[in-house]
Amino acid sequence: ALTFVLPLDDQVFTRELWESATECPVVFPDGVGVVGWMVPGGRAIAEKTAELMEKYDVAIWAHHGMFCSGEDFDLTFGLMHTVEKSAEILVKILSMTPRKIQTITPENFRELAHDFNVTLPEEFLYEKKK
C-alpha cells in the first residue's frame, strides 16, 4: 500500500521504514531499493531487481510486493517480517495524520548504529523539512 502514497524513492522508503520501528536499521542497515511499476514476472523487473540487490537485501516492487535475500531461510524470513511490520506501523501512522509530531532523528540513528555496531549510509540520515 505504501507505494501508492510515498515517492518511489530508495531514500524516502528506507527512512520512513526505519522511523517506524527502531529495529529496522539494525535488521536492514543498507536500506531498501524501490522498483517502479513494471510487468510482474518478466525479464525487465528481474533485471531491475537484480541491479538493486547488488546494493540492498530488500527490493520493493511498486503496487506488487517485495523481494528479500538473506544468508538462509530464517534470516530472510525475519528480514521480510521486519519490513512488513514496519510498513504496517507506517500505514497506521499515515491513517491517523499526514505528519509525525515526533520520530527517530538522524542523531538517534547514529547512536543506534554505534551501539549495535552497524554502518548506516549517510544518504538516509538527512534532515527532514519541517
List where the protein language model places each region.
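Glycine-rich flexible loops
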Residues: A1-K130
